[in-house]
Amino acid sequence: NYTIGNDNVLTEPLSEIKTAGLMYKMGVQ
């Protein structure tokens, strides 16, 4: 459970960054 918790902590921000990056690219284009 501890490892899964760490994965969630790392994955959550990464997915938000990827989503923000996609929205930024679509906004620019």
UniProtKB/Swiss-Prot annotation:
What does the record give as EC number? 3.6.1.1
Where would you find this protein in the cell?
Periplasm
Transmembrane stretches, by residue range?
Answer: none
Q: Which UniProt keywords apply?
A: Hydrolase, Periplasm
Which superkingdom is the protein from?
Bacteria
Does the record's keyword annotation contain Hydrolase?
A: yes
Which Cys-Cys disulphide bridges does the record give?
A: none
| A single Gene Ontology CC term | periplasmic space
**Protein name as catalogued:** Inorganic pyrophosphatase
What are the top taxonomic ranks of the organism? Bacteria, Pseudomonadati, Thermodesulfobacteriota, Desulfovibrionia, Desulfovibrionales
